[in-house]
């Protein structure tokens, strides 16, 4: 199993247990980011998907209305919600990309130009749809580390989470 950790905070933020998709259904951005589909699950009740196997599907799962429902990836990895204004995000992402570029120049110089080109399209998409996003950081609440981008696709009841690949370290267990 692979676990993805933030490059700077070392917080675990995702794993390969969740299928990776093109971010925002845009294959051009897949060189810099990946997206995972999440599920809402009852907090503290781990049935490992057994409750989803009935004929009516997950929507008909009997859940006590007093039980708190959480987003599986957010809960499992202890992601913390972060409130940002568009101005705050613009300032943050400028500094974060500079930091990532410096790291790439040191460790993987041939990756710098393709990263800079594609990540600018990623940021443009986020800024153009800013109201649709929620943001998370890792468990350590390191605000200089990478962000996790959450948005709702269509009528889905659980958010999709998007991660910048170059801000992650892959660890095998």
Curated annotation (Swiss-Prot):
Domain of life: Eukaryota
InterPro entries for this protein: Mss4-like_sf, Mss4/transl-control_tumour, TCTP, Translation_control_tumour_CS, Translational_control_tumour_p
PANTHER family: TRANSLATIONALLY CONTROLLED TUMOR PROTEIN-RELATED, TRANSLATIONALLY-CONTROLLED TUMOR PROTEIN
UniProt keyword Metal-binding present: no
Lineage: Eukaryota, Sar, Alveolata, Apicomplexa, Aconoidasida
Protein localization: Cytoplasm
Keyword Calcium included in the entry's annotation: yes
Function: Involved in calcium binding and microtubule stabilization.
GO terms for cellular component: cytoplasm
GO molecular function, one term: calcium ion binding
Pfam family, one: TCTP
Gene of this entry: TCTP
Alphabetically ordered keywords of this record: Calcium, Cytoplasm
Gene3D superfamilies tied to this protein: Metal Binding Protein, Guanine Nucleotide Exchange Factor, Chain A (2.170.150.10)
Organism, scientific name: Theileria parva (East coast fever infection agent)
Protein name (database record): Translationally-controlled tumor protein homolog
UniProt record similarity statement: Belongs to the TCTP family.
Residue span(s) of domain TCTP: 1-173
Main location: cytoplasm
